[in-house]
Amino acid sequence: MAVYCYALNSLVIMNSTNELKSGSPLPSGSETPQPSGRAALSPGSVFSPGRGASFLFPPAESLSLEEPGSAGGWRSGRRRLNSSSGSGGGSSSSNSSSSSGVGSPSWAGRLRGDAQQVVATRILSPPGPEEAQRKLRILQRELQNVQVNQKVGMFEAQIQAQTSAIQAPRSPRLGRARSPSPCPFRSSSQPPERVLAPCSPSEERRTKSWGEQCTETPDANSRRRSRLSTHPSKDKEGVAPLLGPASPTRLGTQSPSTSVRMERGSPASPRCGSPTPMEIDKRTAPSLEHFGTSLTLATKVAASAASAGPHPGHDSVLMEADCELGAMRPWEAHLERRGQFLGRETGSAPEPIRTHIREPPGRVERVHSVGGQGSWTPEVIKRPEEGTVDAQSSELSENPRWSRLPGDPGSVGPEKGGSRIPGIRGPQQTLDSMREGSSALGLLGGSQAAQPGSMDVETGISCGRMLEPLPPGEVTTNLKEPQCLPGDRMGMQPESSIVWPSAVEEAPLIWTCDTGIQLKGTWRSQDGDAHPSCQEKSPDQKDKACSPSNIPAIPAVIITDMGAQEDGGLEEIQGSPRGPLPLRKLSSSSASSTGFSSSYEDSEEDISSDPERTLDPNSAFLHTLDQQKPRVSKSWRKIKNMVQWSPFVMSFKKKYPWIQLAGHAGSFKAAANGRILKKHCESEQRCLDRLMADVLRPFVPAYHGDVVKDGERYNQMDDLLADFDSPCVMDCKMGIRTYLEEELTKARKKPSLRKDMYQKMVEVDPEAPTEEEKAQRAVTKPRYMQWRETISSTATLGFRIEGIKKEDGSVNRDFKKTKTREQVTEAFREFTKGNQNILIAYRDRLKAIRETLEVSPFFKCHEVIGSSLLFIHDKKEQAKVWMIDFGKTTPLPEGQTLQHDVPWQEGNREDGYLSGLNNLIDILTEMSQGSPLT
């Protein structure tokens, strides 16, 4: 931008020199060449037909005497175009310029534009009396016929057409936290020493028209014209004030039509970065009186008085002009722009006051106006991570609930007075900081009403210096409830102290150019991870402060390491002294409906790989679903496997006790959608495939094919416990033998002594082993298998009870010696608690199974060995029986069938399945005919 300013400066000087040599009757002063292709000016413009260069003049009411102390006053006999005041060189007696600095008319600075105007001034010899009189008449005629709003519109169009295609240079400096987003041009004439000022209340009023008048008091005008750049040599370098919202003055009158033309005619805002080092180093440090009201960090605040007209609004383009300010950080540049808005739109202050500066950048949200000029309304401070704000929050209409508090001397009109209502969100939202997702800046604007007395400044930042961020680790105060003190003084009451985690260099803000995109600010607090950002607010919520008390807590999900407990074998089921867990036990289908079914699919270990491990509720931990900082210490698969002690999901062992009862604890995994996975067995898969097409299908678990998981194949079938709540389960092994004839033949061919089987035999019956077996302290497998059938009811009744699990979780497998009919009846009575409805339901179900078996083609041509009947009922008196475990069920040779109810002899392959089923039906029928349960 500086190079561009130099080029324009050279062109203007050359053009003015040519006109001087040719004797052109133009006034000596600042001129801006009109580029070719520029739109023609309106008939009321100031360009006379004889002129070759364009020149605009400020309104007549803005012409006034300069302060006595200012250099180059209009009484010095020279004309000067004041680049930072409202005079603009419009006096009839001013003849020449007294400075060679580059500037722009003050009224041009109020134009909404995204570029800079460079106006060169030259020292020329005083013209003759006749020429001066002629120029005076021309000026008077032009000032009478030209409307200021037309000048503004056309002049803005020229500036935008001149600079719309120019890309600002990027600063090569490194190590600064800067904006990653494009932003409009900034004012390069602002010195780095200038104290930042808070934003004007009307900066964010987007819904009001520009057409409203804002006549300024003479005091305000004199303040804005009071200073010229005190460093002409630096002004010469092409550092011109920003045209647009950053200009310190504003036009006195402006029509709605002009505002519409200006808004529609403005091109897209060009991108810009930080200025070049040359431009940074050449900034000047004028006094704070340039801006009618500005915030003095260590001394005072020049508060605003009333303006004589309605408060002007802003369109959306005005909110775009946030950019880095030289060596400043983005938030500092942001504040400096707001200081310019404040100086432009507020009146003079009768008396300065002090304000509190307590928070680092991002800790305090910018205060908002509640409808009045020179009034501020504090809001409850947002946390740093609350940087994401819905774009809707920036498009607000005026709130009819605003009220004006008495005692505000700066209030003029019913809605223009300074009402200060803490905690009420006004019509203007934080457009630059909230809308682009950046955190709020570390300033609290104080009340701007005339108030005797002062507030203590708490940061000690001296006047004339930039507002530096607090160093890392410095204790700051989290302001919660701003209190409106008497006389509209704003005091902030600290609530708690926190440690600011890092310097501003490590946490740059995110800026955009009026895109409405929600971006998360990078300001983070170490103690605020659990609080979500206040992003979307309903219209009723927009006038409420966003405080942690209004933030709903995120429900925690209790998860536990499934891998550490899933294998905990169902040994806990068999006689564990622990009582039932205080958790609702659900089946996997119920669990799948809660969204945790995927955890079953990712089980890392088999459920019986370590049967000695127990379920320890103390190992449960609380895992919060943190959206701010996702945990990366554990893999997602591990997390899904840890759902164990959730109130929605019960233990896998509790849901599948029949797995342990049937002796297959190491073969199962849980699956989703009410299914379980059993280790693949070729013979069982073949049987299940055939059963799905057989009449027995209603009495067997539904088979859903085989799947590969963790490198292993599994048969996937229905979870039979899905429809039961706290079920009672019994496993009965059917048949008069539980081993295949092939197993017996193989064991005889290669007999091997098994000490483990001898130990089991001795535990059941110490007198069972023979003298030879006692001497060897070992038995063969065939011997053990045959002995095993004789000690239970298998050999006598055709079935035996493997185990019972009650609804309270207690497990009993001590049925090895349950041999007689009376013992079996007592076991069923204990299992059903004598409930006649359950006994009748079991009996009827067994009868239906028997009728189906008698006509089943599958049953006739298969030797069913090691299969079980699974009895399930619950407290709702639901009772079902299923046929399970077909791993040892083998097909017979072609044309051979079995009767299933004749005694077994080695070689006939009879299994005695129907014999055992008939005995079960008889026992249950006898029990169901007994006296009903009282």
Curated annotation (Swiss-Prot):
The signal peptide here is none
The UniProt regions of compositional bias labelled Polar residues, in chain numbering, are 20-35, 210-220, 250-260
Q: What is this protein called?
A: Inositol-trisphosphate 3-kinase B
Q: Which organism's genome codes for this protein?
A: Rattus norvegicus
Q: Where mainly found?
A: cytoplasm
> What regulation of activity is recorded for this protein?
IP3K is activated by calcium and calmodulin. Form B is much more sensitive to calcium/calmodulin than form A.
On the tree of life, the source organism's domain of life is: Eukaryota
Q: Which GO terms describe its cellular component?
A: cytoplasm; cytoskeleton; cytosol; endoplasmic reticulum; membrane; nucleus
